[in-house]
Amino acid sequence: MSQSTIHKIAVKKRTETGKNENNRLRSSGMIPVNIIGAGVATSGAVNEKELAKMVHSGIRQSTLIELDVEGQGQQKVFVKEIQRFPEIDRIRHVDFYKVVPGQKIVTKIGIETTGVAKGSKTGGQFEHIIHEIRVKTIPEDLLENLTIDVTDLDVGDSIKISQLKVPASWEILINGDPIVTSVNKTKALLAAERAEAKGAAPDDAKAKKGKK
């Protein structure tokens, strides 16, 4: 498992809103943001370069972020939505929502693998099928990514959702019990097995004749 890394960024409060004010902010190197909690939205602005660095570091919906809000102190949040300009790679607006300790939320958790599957060394093909899952859990048990060790997977083996080692508070929101990773036989391996079986068949027939 991979514990959530807390990213930090300063937020300057703003009282003026609207299209013109947002454009003015962007031209000065700031990006408008909203902090949502208990049905109330607080308007603010963050440094564009710092925000872009944080976003490009690979944050997810499950990434815990600590905002240092002007006049309000530190607030822990998650990203609700990142809006971008469609024609250029630039952030337009970000919505954050406040963390409420003990209150369950629904978010997405990435699944990563570590190690080299044993079966892939003997002709099998490793497949990573599910890369992300939706989870309902409390903020205290959130992980940025779920890492599973596939070292012991041999040809024909697989890891299903029900076999994942996750915190007790997690409710994985998915239908059935699908396969997350597996090691399957390649066409070459299947062909080799068929050829071996055909080669053994005449020998078996001769052995049976000799017994008569």
UniProtKB/Swiss-Prot annotation:
One biological process term in Gene Ontology: translation
UniProt keyword annotation of Protein transport present: no
Keyword Repeat in record: no
Keywords: Ribonucleoprotein, Ribosomal protein, RNA-binding, rRNA-binding
GO CC, alphabetical: cytosolic large ribosomal subunit
Family annotation (InterPro entries): Rbsml_bL25/Gln-tRNA_synth_N, Ribosomal_bL25/Gln-tRNA_synth, Ribosomal_bL25_b-dom, Ribosomal_bL25_C, Ribosomal_bL25_long, Ribosomal_L25_dom, Ribosomal_uL5_bac-type
Pfam families named in the record: Ribosomal_L25p, Ribosomal_TL5_C
Annotated Basic and acidic residues bias: 13-24
Complexes and interactors: Part of the 50S ribosomal subunit; part of the 5S rRNA/L5/L18/L25 subcomplex. Contacts the 5S rRNA. Binds to the 5S rRNA independently of L5 and L18.
NCBIfam families assigned: bL25_bact_ctc (TIGR00731), PRK05618.3-2 (NF004136)
Protein family per UniProt: Belongs to the bacterial ribosomal protein bL25 family. CTC subfamily.
Function: This is one of the proteins that binds to the 5S RNA in the ribosome where it forms part of the central protuberance.
Protein name per Swiss-Prot or TrEMBL: Large ribosomal subunit protein bL25
Native source organism of the sequence: Leptospira borgpetersenii serovar Hardjo-bovis (strain JB197)
